[in-house]
Amino acid sequence: MSQPVRDAWKRLFNDIYAQVPRTLGTLPGYRPALNKNSEKRTSNVYSNVELLEVWRKLNEAPSDRRDAFRLDLITVGRQVLGNYFLDVKMEFDRMVEAKDYQALKACGEKMKEILNDLDKLNAFHPYCSLDKWIDDARKMGDSPQLKDYYEKNARNLITTWGGSLNDYASRSWAGLISDYYAKRWEVYIDTFIKAVGEGVEVDQKQLEDELKEIEEGWVNATCLLYTSPSPR
Protein backbone atom coordinates (compact mmCIF):
# COMPACT_ATOMS: atom_id res chain seq x y z
CA MET A 1 0.00 0.00 0.00
CA SER A 2 1.45 3.37 -1.02
CA GLN A 3 2.05 6.19 1.45
CA PRO A 4 -0.70 8.46 0.04
CA VAL A 5 -3.22 5.66 0.58
CA ARG A 6 -1.98 5.05 4.13
CA ASP A 7 -2.27 8.78 4.86
CA ALA A 8 -5.77 8.86 3.39
CA TRP A 9 -7.05 5.97 5.50
CA LYS A 10 -5.43 7.38 8.64
CA ARG A 11 -7.15 10.71 8.06
CA LEU A 12 -10.43 8.98 7.28
CA PHE A 13 -10.25 7.04 10.54
CA ASN A 14 -9.20 9.97 12.74
CA ASP A 15 -11.32 12.77 11.25
CA ILE A 16 -14.36 11.08 9.70
CA TYR A 17 -15.00 7.62 11.15
CA ALA A 18 -14.28 8.83 14.68
CA GLN A 19 -17.43 10.97 14.55
CA VAL A 20 -20.81 9.72 15.73
CA PRO A 21 -22.37 8.00 12.68
CA ARG A 22 -25.52 9.68 11.42
CA THR A 23 -25.47 10.00 7.65
CA LEU A 24 -27.42 7.33 5.76
CA GLY A 25 -27.16 8.75 2.27
CA THR A 26 -26.72 11.86 0.17
CA LEU A 27 -29.35 14.38 -0.89
CA PRO A 28 -29.34 13.65 -4.65
CA GLY A 29 -31.12 10.36 -3.88
CA TYR A 30 -34.12 11.97 -2.18
CA ARG A 31 -37.19 13.68 -3.62
CA PRO A 32 -36.59 17.45 -3.94
CA ALA A 33 -38.48 19.77 -1.61
CA LEU A 34 -37.98 23.43 -0.73
CA ASN A 35 -36.16 23.96 2.59
CA LYS A 36 -36.31 20.25 3.31
CA ASN A 37 -33.10 18.29 2.99
CA SER A 38 -33.80 14.93 4.68
CA GLU A 39 -31.62 16.06 7.58
CA LYS A 40 -31.82 12.75 9.45
CA ARG A 41 -30.42 10.97 6.41
CA THR A 42 -28.03 13.43 4.82
CA SER A 43 -26.53 15.62 7.55
CA ASN A 44 -23.01 14.97 8.78
CA VAL A 45 -20.86 16.08 11.68
CA TYR A 46 -17.53 16.20 9.88
CA SER A 47 -15.95 18.71 7.53
CA ASN A 48 -16.41 17.95 3.85
CA VAL A 49 -13.07 19.69 3.29
CA GLU A 50 -11.45 16.92 5.34
CA LEU A 51 -13.18 14.25 3.27
CA LEU A 52 -12.14 16.02 0.07
CA GLU A 53 -8.53 15.84 1.27
CA VAL A 54 -8.91 12.09 1.84
CA TRP A 55 -10.21 11.71 -1.71
CA ARG A 56 -7.33 13.80 -3.06
CA LYS A 57 -4.78 11.59 -1.31
CA LEU A 58 -6.41 8.43 -2.64
CA ASN A 59 -6.19 9.91 -6.12
CA GLU A 60 -2.47 10.55 -5.59
CA ALA A 61 -1.85 6.82 -5.25
CA PRO A 62 -0.04 5.02 -8.08
CA SER A 63 -2.37 3.60 -10.71
CA ASP A 64 -4.25 0.69 -9.15
CA ARG A 65 -6.92 -1.16 -11.08
CA ARG A 66 -7.96 -3.50 -8.28
CA ASP A 67 -11.72 -3.57 -7.77
CA ALA A 68 -11.50 -2.83 -4.05
CA PHE A 69 -9.41 0.30 -4.56
CA ARG A 70 -11.61 1.54 -7.39
CA LEU A 71 -14.66 1.09 -5.16
CA ASP A 72 -12.94 3.07 -2.41
CA LEU A 73 -12.29 5.94 -4.80
CA ILE A 74 -15.91 5.94 -5.94
CA THR A 75 -17.38 5.61 -2.45
CA VAL A 76 -15.36 8.47 -0.98
CA GLY A 77 -15.81 10.64 -4.06
CA ARG A 78 -19.56 10.30 -4.27
CA GLN A 79 -19.87 11.23 -0.60
CA VAL A 80 -17.77 14.34 -1.22
CA LEU A 81 -19.93 15.31 -4.19
CA GLY A 82 -23.14 14.45 -2.34
CA ASN A 83 -22.16 16.67 0.58
CA TYR A 84 -21.28 19.48 -1.82
CA PHE A 85 -24.66 19.06 -3.54
CA LEU A 86 -26.38 19.54 -0.18
CA ASP A 87 -24.51 22.82 0.39
CA VAL A 88 -25.41 24.16 -3.06
CA LYS A 89 -29.04 23.07 -2.71
CA MET A 90 -29.36 24.92 0.60
CA GLU A 91 -28.00 28.03 -1.13
CA PHE A 92 -30.47 27.48 -3.98
CA ASP A 93 -33.34 27.47 -1.49
CA ARG A 94 -32.05 30.65 0.13
CA MET A 95 -31.96 32.33 -3.28
CA VAL A 96 -35.57 31.25 -3.87
CA GLU A 97 -36.56 33.06 -0.69
CA ALA A 98 -34.42 36.07 -1.65
CA LYS A 99 -35.89 36.13 -5.20
CA ASP A 100 -32.35 36.45 -6.59
CA TYR A 101 -32.85 35.20 -10.14
CA GLN A 102 -29.24 35.26 -11.35
CA ALA A 103 -27.84 33.60 -8.22
CA LEU A 104 -30.63 31.03 -8.40
CA LYS A 105 -29.74 30.15 -11.99
CA ALA A 106 -26.07 29.78 -11.05
CA CYS A 107 -26.92 27.43 -8.17
CA GLY A 108 -29.24 25.42 -10.38
CA GLU A 109 -26.58 24.93 -13.04
CA LYS A 110 -24.06 23.90 -10.39
CA MET A 111 -26.50 21.32 -8.99
CA LYS A 112 -27.00 19.83 -12.45
CA GLU A 113 -23.24 19.67 -12.98
CA ILE A 114 -22.74 17.82 -9.70
CA LEU A 115 -25.41 15.27 -10.62
CA ASN A 116 -23.70 14.71 -13.95
CA ASP A 117 -20.33 14.28 -12.24
CA LEU A 118 -21.83 11.81 -9.76
CA ASP A 119 -23.25 9.72 -12.56
CA LYS A 120 -19.94 9.62 -14.42
CA LEU A 121 -17.99 8.75 -11.28
CA ASN A 122 -20.19 5.78 -10.43
CA ALA A 123 -19.94 4.44 -13.98
CA PHE A 124 -16.36 3.38 -13.30
CA HIS A 125 -17.46 0.19 -11.54
CA PRO A 126 -20.25 -2.24 -12.49
CA TYR A 127 -21.34 -2.62 -8.85
CA CYS A 128 -22.18 1.09 -8.86
CA SER A 129 -24.24 0.96 -12.03
CA LEU A 130 -27.97 0.53 -12.60
CA ASP A 131 -27.58 -1.57 -15.73
CA LYS A 132 -26.15 -4.50 -13.76
CA TRP A 133 -29.06 -4.34 -11.28
CA ILE A 134 -31.64 -4.38 -14.07
CA ASP A 135 -29.79 -7.02 -16.07
CA ASP A 136 -29.56 -9.35 -13.06
CA ALA A 137 -33.28 -8.91 -12.36
CA ARG A 138 -34.29 -9.70 -15.93
CA LYS A 139 -32.13 -12.84 -15.94
CA MET A 140 -34.43 -14.31 -13.29
CA GLY A 141 -37.32 -14.50 -15.76
CA ASP A 142 -37.67 -17.24 -18.37
CA SER A 143 -40.22 -15.37 -20.49
CA PRO A 144 -40.62 -11.75 -21.65
CA GLN A 145 -43.51 -11.29 -19.22
CA LEU A 146 -41.51 -12.58 -16.24
CA LYS A 147 -38.47 -10.55 -17.24
CA ASP A 148 -40.61 -7.39 -17.23
CA TYR A 149 -42.14 -8.42 -13.90
CA TYR A 150 -38.77 -8.84 -12.21
CA GLU A 151 -37.47 -5.62 -13.71
CA LYS A 152 -40.44 -3.66 -12.37
CA ASN A 153 -39.85 -5.08 -8.90
CA ALA A 154 -36.15 -4.27 -9.13
CA ARG A 155 -36.94 -0.67 -10.10
CA ASN A 156 -39.54 -0.40 -7.34
CA LEU A 157 -37.18 -1.63 -4.62
CA ILE A 158 -34.61 1.12 -5.16
CA THR A 159 -37.05 3.99 -5.72
CA THR A 160 -40.68 4.28 -4.64
CA TRP A 161 -40.88 1.06 -2.59
CA GLY A 162 -44.51 0.73 -3.64
CA GLY A 163 -45.25 4.30 -2.56
CA SER A 164 -45.04 3.62 1.16
CA LEU A 165 -41.33 4.27 1.72
CA ASN A 166 -40.26 6.53 -1.13
CA ASP A 167 -36.45 6.68 -1.53
CA TYR A 168 -36.01 4.37 1.48
CA ALA A 169 -33.47 2.29 -0.45
CA SER A 170 -31.94 5.06 -2.55
CA ARG A 171 -28.71 4.19 -4.34
CA SER A 172 -25.99 6.40 -5.75
CA TRP A 173 -25.63 4.46 -9.00
CA ALA A 174 -24.72 5.44 -12.53
CA GLY A 175 -27.86 5.41 -14.61
CA LEU A 176 -30.15 5.75 -11.62
CA ILE A 177 -28.75 9.22 -11.04
CA SER A 178 -29.01 10.39 -14.66
CA ASP A 179 -32.21 8.57 -15.60
CA TYR A 180 -34.19 9.07 -12.38
CA TYR A 181 -32.79 11.36 -9.67
CA ALA A 182 -31.52 14.03 -12.07
CA LYS A 183 -34.88 14.12 -13.85
CA ARG A 184 -36.62 14.97 -10.58
CA TRP A 185 -34.03 17.58 -9.66
CA GLU A 186 -34.23 19.21 -13.09
CA VAL A 187 -37.98 19.69 -12.65
CA TYR A 188 -37.46 21.14 -9.16
CA ILE A 189 -34.67 23.48 -10.29
CA ASP A 190 -36.35 24.66 -13.48
CA THR A 191 -39.71 25.16 -11.76
CA PHE A 192 -38.33 27.52 -9.13
CA ILE A 193 -36.09 29.41 -11.56
CA LYS A 194 -39.06 30.00 -13.86
CA ALA A 195 -41.28 31.10 -10.97
CA VAL A 196 -38.74 33.56 -9.59
CA GLY A 197 -38.07 34.92 -13.09
CA GLU A 198 -41.79 35.52 -13.62
CA GLY A 199 -42.40 36.83 -10.11
CA VAL A 200 -44.95 34.15 -9.22
CA GLU A 201 -45.24 31.49 -6.52
CA VAL A 202 -44.68 27.82 -7.26
CA ASP A 203 -47.74 25.59 -7.19
CA GLN A 204 -46.40 23.03 -4.72
CA LYS A 205 -49.15 20.51 -5.44
CA GLN A 206 -48.46 20.66 -9.16
CA LEU A 207 -44.72 20.27 -8.54
CA GLU A 208 -45.27 17.24 -6.34
CA ASP A 209 -47.57 15.70 -8.94
CA GLU A 210 -44.90 16.19 -11.63
CA LEU A 211 -42.29 14.49 -9.45
CA LYS A 212 -44.62 11.57 -8.73
CA GLU A 213 -45.32 11.22 -12.44
CA ILE A 214 -41.59 10.90 -13.11
CA GLU A 215 -41.27 8.30 -10.36
CA GLU A 216 -44.21 6.17 -11.44
CA GLY A 217 -43.25 6.37 -15.10
CA TRP A 218 -39.73 5.21 -14.37
CA VAL A 219 -40.80 2.29 -12.17
CA ASN A 220 -43.21 1.05 -14.84
CA ALA A 221 -40.74 1.38 -17.72
CA THR A 222 -38.92 -1.62 -19.14
CA CYS A 223 -36.46 0.17 -21.36
CA LEU A 224 -33.13 1.21 -19.88
CA LEU A 225 -31.96 4.18 -21.91
CA TYR A 226 -28.70 4.55 -20.02
CA THR A 227 -25.42 2.91 -21.03
CA SER A 228 -22.45 3.14 -18.70
CA PRO A 229 -19.39 4.74 -20.31
CA SER A 230 -16.30 2.58 -20.47
CA PRO A 231 -13.72 3.43 -17.77
CA ARG A 232 -10.59 5.06 -19.12
Each language-model region and where it sits:
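C-terminal non-catalytic alpha-helical accessory regions
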Residues: 1-222
